């Protein structure tokens, strides 16, 4: 069927900020879809609130709106643009929920707008638990016994009938939010109560638990002519009971017989046809390992995290084709872009194994609840490709960047057998390493299977890895053992460890015997047809399929898996850098390990290597491709950390040189550089042990800010008040980077701002200064940032620009640089300098219109700012006000304290832009879900050092009609100052303590601060977590509360009696 001519203008809804459960895969899907629709000649309108995405670049759609994804704003845009149709299936759960809301509000009918891709009835049937159950019964598809409940009592009655364990799944929530497995009535009551609150329709599904079954996923496509196919089938290493986003996954399925595969395939195709989905769809099934019995778990009627993985695992561009199907094209008339000859109707065939391992944030959140269940906790994931399962698993392990180069954590060798068995049974994020340790200790795989319900096939592969380790131990320097280990994915580093040698010795031994990896192409058809894609993975076999071209090439290192502190912003910079390299006439090569992102889309670069970002893997690509040089400044800390070793191996690092990177990172060198340049910084010292640190703190005076050098996202950074806390910090935190000393700085409590600059070594372009709303002490990634600055005098802005120029030239920066400043008493201090692209690059590029990463790349390749038509110094300011606001995922992470501080905690960001600060703030708060009602009750519980400041806020809240409530100490202080506040009870005082009031909906907002000492107060944490659970706006920094107040006041009319 040819494409539709009756529609011209299509609106695509994006997925908003990155949160746990909805990450960069939707940027990849949305970007592909917009480009595919433009390619077919449609006018595309995009709405998304997340500036850190490629999808919100001007060239991706005809019109791009970076506005809050709320009914109020989307409705306005629709009325302004009048699209003929809306495509909601590429915006994750956010997109689907928005489509449902627009329909319920009558907007779609009113303006005669059609929904493309998936009909509303299908979204309803897949998402509404009752309708889904009815449909499965009609299709004779088995589902676990279940019931829909609207109260906790109904849940208890049902569970008594069918017996425990049961699973609770709230309707219309994302990433299993609010759900869980309950093995007792007590757990059931707690989880159901929370689940009902989180479900927008106040309903939960209670179902019999099938934990322990194999979890299998099918990624399917269907078009309007009812052609349907399976793109990829995937098998979870972990059995049912752990969210698929938190499971290790292999593609294709590894343990199914042909009969089982066909049975589940038929079920998946039957379901997509019954739902009449036009586009992509993901079906999750549970298979009994001991019979042919299976259950359908759930269906996602949209592009999902699994479809991004399936696209990268097979090379089949699901989102692109889904967008074209939505406008009427069919699978049998679209060419598969990978082969360029076969049609999209061909099911991909794989002659390799793909492994995906999730990346968790527990290196940042040491107190977080690490046990895995039906609620997702991973922030990102890595993928690796190999010719056997062992190879792909080990490559994925070393892609994770958690300090391991193998499926082994050395720290586990000291734990007791008892602890080991507990950790093997109760799955945590690192269970793979505990399982491997158990096998090394001689536990039989049969025993482990009965404890974990993980298939023997997988455990046998882990045993095989251990057998190869033992073989290496017995045959040191043996070439055949080396060859075998390399074939199964062992790294040089691991082999060196076993043979007690240096990694370079193993590399030399490989080279002397011509033992190099070859690169195989990902071609969707198991090499049956010729493919034209430049998409490769390494393996130790004979035939190499990647040929060096005769064009000069440049290698760009990506940023690996998404984690807190290193998000999609770095991928954004990577993609832009590649565009500039191609424009300059070079061949652009990307190396990365993250399946969710735009950078690993094979159509972005001239060549893509899907490989771990380790020294060995990068060097292997360099040996083959012989690029002119490598760019490391766009890949976050991941790429910067490789610069030293690559440079020592003789590789040309383009842009800022390694010794200059070192001058910015190494404390003593940095201090020396600042002194030479005459730039003030907070007084500070380095320390390598406890005595030195105490001595430094004594000299500088408390409070001090302590942190390890060479880290990203404020990892292990703390503000310390006294000697005892400093000792405690050194004993627990310094392990963050063993060979580098820690830094002890005077802590200046002032206004913070940051600058991104681009330098060619002689002149420096400063696109803009971003002023932080929160004062120093809150990590820059967690602060709200305003551009252009609203409260900095012209003189201070000039000083900042001057210092930035001096730094860029003094540190020989070529390309990007980020500088953070703190201002106190009109004095500007430099806190830190990062000679690389930072997380503010996409935001600043969008609001200034300067394609910063592209310009930086051109400078790295030898052009000057003057060549490109840019002046030296601060770029003219934008007339609008733009705000970047952080977005957190605390609802997904139990036991993680939501208090803001110097260690970064946000997972994503949104942007609000308008003609005034108040309007821009309003949009930013709406976009990050901090909607505050116009009146209600607000609770203050404030540390002594900020009570005076809180008082003036409380007075302003009262003036606009809020009722003030406060805890004992705060209420007493307010009363002394003439402001009466309702007293709330102490924690544990069942009737009116804060958590109880919050639970009953009596509180609209909470302002809760702790002293500089930031002691982990149990009560405060309970108050904060109750606010997070119930979705009540919580302010842990007075500056944020002040910003919100500004918005409320601007929307308030003055009402006075005459």
Curated annotation (Swiss-Prot):
Task: Specify where the region named Carbamoyl phosphate synthetic domain lies, as residue ranges.
Answer: 547-929
Task: Give the source's domain of life in one word.
Answer: Bacteria
Residues reported in the UniProt entry to bind Mg(2+) 1: 284, 298
One example of the protein's molecular function in GO is: metal ion binding
Q: Where does Mn(2+) 4 bind?
A: 832, 834
**Organism whose genome encodes this protein:** Streptococcus pyogenes serotype M1
Q: What is the lineage of its organism?
A: Bacteria, Bacillati, Bacillota, Bacilli, Lactobacillales
Subunit details for this protein?
A: Composed of two chains; the small (or glutamine) chain promotes the hydrolysis of glutamine to ammonia, which is used by the large (or ammonia) chain to synthesize carbamoyl phosphate. Tetramer of heterodimers (alpha,beta)4.
All copies of the ATP-grasp domain together span 133-327, 671-861
Protein name from the UniProt record: Carbamoyl phosphate synthase large chain
């Amino acid at each position: 069927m040819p494409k539709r001519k009756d529609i011209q203008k299509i609106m695509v809804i994006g997925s908003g900020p990155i949160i746990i459960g909805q990450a960069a895969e939707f940027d990849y899907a949305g970007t592909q879809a917009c480009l595919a629709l433009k390619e077919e000649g449609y006018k595309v309108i995009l709405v998304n609130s997340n500036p850190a995405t490629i999808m919100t670049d001007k060239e991706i759609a005809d019109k791009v709106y970076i506005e809050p994804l709320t009914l109020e704003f989307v409705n306005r845009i629709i009325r302004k643009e009048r699209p003929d149709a809306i495509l909601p299936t590429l915006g994750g759960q956010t997109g689907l929920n928005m489509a449902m809301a627009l329909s319920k509000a009558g907007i779609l009918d009113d303006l005669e707008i059609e929904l493309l891709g998936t009909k509303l009835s299908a979204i309803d049937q897949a998402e509404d638990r009752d309708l889904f159950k009815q449909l499965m019964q009609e299709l004779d598809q088995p589902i676990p016994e279940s019931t829909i409940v609207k109260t906790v009592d109904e849940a208890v009655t049902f569970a008594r009938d069918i017996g425990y364990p049961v699973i609770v799944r709230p309707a219309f929530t994302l990433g299993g939010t609010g759900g869980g497995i309950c093995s007792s009535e007590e757990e059931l009551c707690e989880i159901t109560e929370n689940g009902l609150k989180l479900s927008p329709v106040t309903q939960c599904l209670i179902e019999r638990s099938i934990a322990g079954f194999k979890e299998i996923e099918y990624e399917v496509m269907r078009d309007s002519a009812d052609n349907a196919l399976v793109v990829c089938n995937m098998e979870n290493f972990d059995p049912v009971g752990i969210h698929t986003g938190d499971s290790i996954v292999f593609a294709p399925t590894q343990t199914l017989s042909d009969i089982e595969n066909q049975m589940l395939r038929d079920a998946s195709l039957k379901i997509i046809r019954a739902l009449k989905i036009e586009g992509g769809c993901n079906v999750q099934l549970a298979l009994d390992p001991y019979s042919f019995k299976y259950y359908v778990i759930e269906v996602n009627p949209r592009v999902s995290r699994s479809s991004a993985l399936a696209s990268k695992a097979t090379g089949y561009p699901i989102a692109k084709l889904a967008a074209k199907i939505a406008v009427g094209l069919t699978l049998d008339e679209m060419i598969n872009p990978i082969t360029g000859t076969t049609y999209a109707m061909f099911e991909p065939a794989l002659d390799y194994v793909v492994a995906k391992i999730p990346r968790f944030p527990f290196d940042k959140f040491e107190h977080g609840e690490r046990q895995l269940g039906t609620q997702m906790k991973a922030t990102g994931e890595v993928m690796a490709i190999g010719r056997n399962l062992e190879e792909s698993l080990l490559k994925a392990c070393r892609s994770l960047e958690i300090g391991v180069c193998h499926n082994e954590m050395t720290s586990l060798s000291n734990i007791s057998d008892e602890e080991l068995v507990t950790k093997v049974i109760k799955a945590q994020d690192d269970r793979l390493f505990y399982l491997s340790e158990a096998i090394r200790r001689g536990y039989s795989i049969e025993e482990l299977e009965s404890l974990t319900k993980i298939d023997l096939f997988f455990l046998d592969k882990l045993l095989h890895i251990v057998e190869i380790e033992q073989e290496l131990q017995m045959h040191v320097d043996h070439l055949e053992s080396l060859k075998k280990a390399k074939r199964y994915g062992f790294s040089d580093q691991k082999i060196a460890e076993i043979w007690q040698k240096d990694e370079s010795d193993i590399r030399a031994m490989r080279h002397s015997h011509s033992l190099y990896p070859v690169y195989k192409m990902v071609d969707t058809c198991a090499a049956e047809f010729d493919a034209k894609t430049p998409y490769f993975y390494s393996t130790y076999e004979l035939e190499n399929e990647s040929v060096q071209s005769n064009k000069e090439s440049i290698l760009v290192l990506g940023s690996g898996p998404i984690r807190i502190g290193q998000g999609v912003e770095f991928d954004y910079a990577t993609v832009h850098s590649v565009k500039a390299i191609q424009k300059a006439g070079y061949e652009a090569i990307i190396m990365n390990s993250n399946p969710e992102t735009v950078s690993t889309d094979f159509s972005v670069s001239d060549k893509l290597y899907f490989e771990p970002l380790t020294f060995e893997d990068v060097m292997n690509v360099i040996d083959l491709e012989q690029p002119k040089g490598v760019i490391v400044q766009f890949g976050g800390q991941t790429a910067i950390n490789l610069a030293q070793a690559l440079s020592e191996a003789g590789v040309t690092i383009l842009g800022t040189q390694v010794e200059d990177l070192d001058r910015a990172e190494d404390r003593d060198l940095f201090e020396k550089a600042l002194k030479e340049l005459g730039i003030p910084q907070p007084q500070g010292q380095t320390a390598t042990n406890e005595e030195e640190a105490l001595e430094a703190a004594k000299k500088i005076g408390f409070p001090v800010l302590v942190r390890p050098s060479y880290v990203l996202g404020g990892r292990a950074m703390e503000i310390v008040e006294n000697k005892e806390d400093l000792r405690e910090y050194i004993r627990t935190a310094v392990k963050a980077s063993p060979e580098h000393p820690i830094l002890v700085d005077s802590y200046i409590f002032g206004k913070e701002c940051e600058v991104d600059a681009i330098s060619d070594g002689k002149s420096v372009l400063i696109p803009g200064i971003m002023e932080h709303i929160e004062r120093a002490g809150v990590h820059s990634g967690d602060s709200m940032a305003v551009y252009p600055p609203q409260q900095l005098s012209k003189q201070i802005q000039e000083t900042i620009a001057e210092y930035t120029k001096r730094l860029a030239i003094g540190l020989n920066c070529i390309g990007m640089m980020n500088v953070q400043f703190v201002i106190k008493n009109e004095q500007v201090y430099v806190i830190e300098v990062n000679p690389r692209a930072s997380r503010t690059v996409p935001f600043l590029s969008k609001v200034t219109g300067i394609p910063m990463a592209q310009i930086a790349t051109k400078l790295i390749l030898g052009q000057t700012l003057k060549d490109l038509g840019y002046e030296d110094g601060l770029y003219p300011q934008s007339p609008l006000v733009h705000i970047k606001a952080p977005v957190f995922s605390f609802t997904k992470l139990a036991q993680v304290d939501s208090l803001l501080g110097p260690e970064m905690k946000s997972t994503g960001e949104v942007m609000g832009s308008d003609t005034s600060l108040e309007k821009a703030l309003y949009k930013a708060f709406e976009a990050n879900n901090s909607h505050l009602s116009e009146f209600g009750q607000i609770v203050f519980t404030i540390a002594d050092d900020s009570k005076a400041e809180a008082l003036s806020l409380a007075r302003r809240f009262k003036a606009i009609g809020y009722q003030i409530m406060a805890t004992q100490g705060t209420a007493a202080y307010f009363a002394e100052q003439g402001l009466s506040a309702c007293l709330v009870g102490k924690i544990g005082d069942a009737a009116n303590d804060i958590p109880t009031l919050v639970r009953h909906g009596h509180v609209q907002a909470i302002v809760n601060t702790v002293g500089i000492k930031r002691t982990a107060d149990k009560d405060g944490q309970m108050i904060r977590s109750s606010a997070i659970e119930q979705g009540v706006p919580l302010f842990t920094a007075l500056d944020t509360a002040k910003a919100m107040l500004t918005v409320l006041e601007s929307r308030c009319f003055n009402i006075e009696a005459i």
